[in-house]
A protein has these predicted regions:
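Active-site helix of classical SDR
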Residues: 59, 95
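SDR active-site lid
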Residues: 101, 108-167
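The beta1-alpha1 cofactor-binding region of Rossmann-like NAD(H)/NADP(H)-dependent oxidoreductases
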Residues: 2-13, 41
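Active-site loop immediately N-terminal to the catalytic Tyr-X3-Lys motif
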Residues: 86-90
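Conserved NAD(P)H cofactor-binding loop of Rossmann-fold oxidoreductase domains
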Residues: 27-32
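Substrate-binding pocket helix/loop in short-chain dehydrogenase/reductase
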Residues: 35-37, 43-48
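Residue(s) in the substrate-gating loop at a strand-loop-helix junction
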Residues: 79
């Protein structure tokens, strides 16, 4: 199902169309690079919609479903960027921090309820994807192979790990 998840109604429509899932992998997102006062505001608003609001809506709707049957796993793809400030990528780093903090908070709620529903966060460094082209950024460190990161993430998710940090 191809949908623009920056549009809130599409997130809700996706949830209506796709039910009874055991796994939710929230992996939509993009970044942008540049001085905060010079980056494009409309692009940043779209980034916030994709990187925060879509994650929030999908996590909430599917978590409600999963809690009803007391099973399921949610993997929110964040970034190591979620743990630190990010000059020249301020909005992106802030969105990933939101994903980390939301996931940590939900994890604590699930723990207190003794729920069998699991939430985890994948926090990779640079990965060899189209992200760099969209974000107008070039990393000066080796990028991880996307297949290896995905395989690592699924393995750790199935083992019940919360923080999944490749490398």
């Amino acid at each position: 199902i191809a949908m623009d998840l920056a549009i809130e109604e599409n997130c809700k429509e996706l949830h209506k169309k796709v039910k009874d899932i055991d796994f939710l992998i929230n992996n939509a997102g993009f970044g942008d690079c540049g001085d905060f006062t010079k980056t494009d505001l409309d692009k940043e608003i779209a980034m916030i919609h994709t990187n925060i609001i879509a994650y929030h809506i999908l996590t909430k709707l599917y978590l409600i479903d999963m809690k009803k049957v007391n099973r399921g796993k949610i993997l929110n793809v964040a970034s190591i960027a979620g743990f630190m400030p990010g000059p020249l990528m301020s909005t992106y780093y802030a969105t990933k921090s939101y994903v980390v903090r939301l996931s940590e908070s939900i994890r604590e709620e699930l723990r207190k309820e003794n729920s069998k529903v699991q939430i985890s966060i994948l926090c990779p460094g640079p990965v060899n994807t189209n992200f760099n082209n969209v974000a107008n950024v070039k990393f000066h460190m080796r990028e991880a192979n996307s297949y290896n990161v995905a395989k690592f993430a699924i393995d750790k998710l199935l083992k019940g790990k919360f923080y999944i940090i490749p490398g």
